[in-house]
Amino acid sequence: MEALEQRIRQDGRILPGHIIKVDGFLNHQVDTKFLGELADEFAKIFDITGVTKILTAEASGIPLAAVCSYKYGIPMVFAKKAKSDNIEGGLYMSEIFSYTYKKTVTLICSKDWITADDKVLVIDDFLANGEAMRGLLDIVKLSGAELVGIGCAIEKGFQHGGDKLREAGYPLHSLAIIDQADENGFVFRKQ
């Protein structure tokens, strides 16, 4: 998506450790109008007819998934990274290694909110090595729900998480794939 690539070039920064910082519009300060454009793009890519849930991970995926949820009129569920006292009943759990936080976390989702009757569209802000996405896909599989698609705003192509998911046959589409990010700037994959 050309508009997203331009926004990354304009407002994105590259930090040590291949961290791509786009917190001025995507996942800290949020440009909801622009996220609406991303949601519109996902609606062109995926057949959202019949989708019953949008699933994402706490916390940075929430803004984009919430905008998609609002625009499509579909409930959003986010997998939590810590069990709180207000979660009751059965849980789906998947242990992942967080690239950003450099530690193992457990994604948790109440069995009340995703069931075998659901058709799930997974939406997230970033895809790097694929660990968080693997955890979300585990939750979909554990629930018995049908996976409709996986939409990511930005994929770090150089970390190959997306390539592995595509090779495994998952219906993944990223709006911008960055194949290189260094002192020379960003190099985007042609799609």
Model regions and ranges:
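Active-site/ligand-binding-proximal alpha/beta "capping" segment
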Residues: 116, 124-142
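Short Gly/Thr/Asp-enriched flexible loops that form oxyanion-binding sites at enzyme active sites
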Residues: 63-72
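Short, glycine/charge-rich flexible loops or terminal/linker lids adjacent to PRPP-binding catalytic cores
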Residues: 74-120, 186-189
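Active-site-facing substrate-recognition patch
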Residues: 1-51
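PRPP-dependent phosphoribosyltransferase catalytic core
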Residues: 2, 7, 18, 137-191
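Conserved acidic residues
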Residues: 52, 118, 148
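Short glycine-rich phosphate-binding loop at a beta-alpha junction
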Residues: 51-58
